[in-house]
């Protein structure tokens, strides 16, 4: 029979030790034995709380931006999957909250940004919120690392080449390889995007498809036959001072 005092002591010791480890080390620790795996599977434990509070900007934790990721571990994961400050147009910067990009008011320029982490396998979802005016063109979707992130003029940059796939929220058109691939969603008089609405990008690398949800309503498959390449969440914008936030949700829930 396990001594409850000893068990509590062991729990507290693990809690202290794991709080000082790096996240990569925690991943390795979860594979050491069943008890450690169970311990780290508690996504709201004090260990994940400590790492979350110490690594995430306070501005993000105080806002409702992370309301779709309910545990400390998933909030932490979302932070490491947010916009990349090193993979965006020179006219874009990432705000101190770590999740929101800001496009500077530069004339005659279209500017894009990619997420830090892309995927080649599995199913993944990101929540995107356009928090400023759309302007004449506002595109969300995915791209490879080869897709261009800045160009002259006001154009639908995402979807302008064979390395990117996008949905233009202004005109409700799908774009790839410089061509309009049809209207989306396939509804009569489909409502246009309203600033602040939550859109989910759903990438299925196993089925090679890209889909979207708006306000938790599935809009259907947008693209099929995606290549066997690492794909990243991406947006392109033209409006000065517009802002776009993105939160990685993990594996999308069916239904």
UniProtKB/Swiss-Prot annotation:
- Locations listed in the record: Synapse
Q: Which residues belong to any copy of the F-box domain?
A: 3-51
Q: Which UniProt keywords apply?
A: Neurogenesis, Synapse, Ubl conjugation pathway
User: A GO biological process this protein is involved in?
Assistant: proteasome-mediated ubiquitin-dependent protein catabolic process
Q: Where is the B30.2/SPRY domain?
A: 61-253
What is a single cellular component term in the Gene Ontology annotation? pole plasm
Where does this chain mainly localize?
other
Entries under SMART domains matching the protein: SPRY
Task: Cite the annotated pathway.
Answer: Protein modification; protein ubiquitination
Superkingdom in the source lineage:
Eukaryota
What InterPro entries does the record tag this protein with? B30.2/SPRY (IPR001870), B30.2/SPRY_sf (IPR043136), ConA-like_dom_sf (IPR013320), F-box-like_dom_sf (IPR036047), F-box_dom (IPR001810), FBXO45-Fsn/SPSB_families (IPR050672), SPRY_dom (IPR003877), SPRY_FBXO45 (IPR035784)
Assembly and interaction partners: Component of an E3 ubiquitin ligase complex composed of hiw and Fsn.
Which family does the entry's similarity section mention? Belongs to the FBXO45/Fsn family.
Task: Describe its function.
Answer: Required in the presynaptic motoneuron to down-regulate the levels of wnd and restrain synaptic terminal growth at the neuromuscular junction (NMJ).
The record's listing under PANTHER family reads: F-BOX_SPRY DOMAIN-CONTAINING PROTEIN 1 (PTHR12245:SF7), SPRY DOMAIN CONTAINING SOCS BOX PROTEIN (PTHR12245)
The name of this protein is F-box/SPRY domain-containing protein 1
Q: What is the lineage of its organism?
A: Eukaryota, Metazoa, Ecdysozoa, Arthropoda, Hexapoda
